[in-house]
Amino acid sequence: MEGEEKLSDNAETEMTVDEIVHIVRIAVGLGISRVKLTGGEPLMRKDVVEIIKDIAAIPGLADLSMTTNGVLLTSLAEELYANGLKRLNISLPTLDEKVYNKLTGGRLGDVLEGVKAAVEAGFYPVKLNMLILKGVNDYTVDEMIEFARETGTILQLIELEPINISDAYYHASHKPLDEYEDMLKQKAVKVETRQFMQNRRIYHLPDVKVEVVHPIENTEFCMYCTRLRVTSDGKLKPCLMKNGNLVDILTPMRNGANDEKLTELFKLANHKRKPYNKS
């Protein structure tokens, strides 16, 4: 199960710590054992350590991870790890300071320090999410592979998806990952398939791993998807690519719905899961 989307500008619709933990507890009771906090930027919440601590304490939870831009990790990595967060995905599209600033408005140095802090705190694995953008960073994959090798991290090459962006931007920036997969196949000493992670391929190169996330026109991405998302305003989202089939769980919770009713809402969301990519 994953959290999703930017933090709400309206404090009334943003979930409290207790509400987040309650939803996760219901999910774990249904057999969901892995939770990832995403965003937006989850580290922007001042109560993020409390959220981590309370979720990690839920009996039956096997794995708790987070996707972050890494900017605030330097000061938070040790505390997050100590309170139960064990794995991290850090968004890092480039190692070029100017390109990074143009893409994000932030400082590359802050993220690089965050990567170092995460590794030193004990997080494993630490994955670097490199979203491939045509003409922006598509020519720097070899450099990123070397950085992952040097830092003991795993590089994830991620294909751009047409989500929350204009059609014009998508068509101008999207680049298929086929050529990178061909290159990785030639260099790999081993190729691993993560069946329950959309059949993703992990290429084991000497002293480094590279994972390829290829969702576009990929029927396996849907066939092997086991994820259910929760938006920051408390809606269950059955499909990453769709917004028309959300199930509101926060409103019933605030109106006093018992756990049996909330469990039924999870089952409804699961029933609404339909493949986006079809053969």
Which residues does each predicted region cover?
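A short local structural element in Rossmann-fold oxidoreductases
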Residues: 1, 77-78, 100-101, 241, ...
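Conserved G/P- and acidic residue-centered "switch" motifs that form tight phosphate/ATP-binding loops
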Residues: 41
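Radical SAM/AdoMet-radical enzyme domain recognition
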Residues: 14-37, 45-156
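Canonical Radical SAM [4Fe-4S] cluster-binding loop centered on the CxxxCxxC motif
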Residues: 1-15, 239-240
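Accessory C-terminal segments flanking Radical SAM cores
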Residues: 162-278
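A short acidic, helix-capping loop that chelates divalent metal ions and anchors anionic groups
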Residues: 4-10, 96-102, 164-168, 247-248
